């Protein structure tokens, strides 16, 4: 129940399912957060440029964020998330409303979060989008954990199949 700024200071980053970018350029979306979190103008610019490169946003740097596609917005949001150097990142439906090609792209960027030293926790209703990128999964239902383990273990869980995937699900 802590306010967002205290969660950020505690090393927790959060990516909302909703579009959450400022109505300014891609570059300024990143630089603005850098100015709040990083000391020194040269360090702020360096981090902004690094994130533009790392998340393939360099060609969009001067584009107004409201003109970005869903996948481009997700990449910008993921990049912004890293500015405060969180140790834990919470992603809420990070691939919601994205087409299959963009989902694959976002999966690669989610995997990159580990390169920044982040533990990643993802909530998503479309678990098929996650099976290739997670080490462990938990299926929740009936107000408790109904299955947990590796992807293979989850797919063998009769309770997960019955209550979440449905009887016609084929792995």
Report each predicted region and the residues it spans:
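ABC ATPase NBD coupling module
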Residues: 1-18, 24, 154-158
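Catalytic Walker B motif of ABC-type/P-loop ATPase nucleotide-binding domains
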Residues: 89-93
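ABC-type ATPase nucleotide-binding domains, specifically the catalytic core motifs of the NBD
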Residues: 2-4, 26-43, 54, 167-168
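Conserved ABC ATPase signature
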Residues: 64-68, 72
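Conserved ABC ATPase "signature" region
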Residues: 42-60, 108-111
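Conserved catalytic motifs of ABC-family nucleotide-binding domains
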Residues: 85
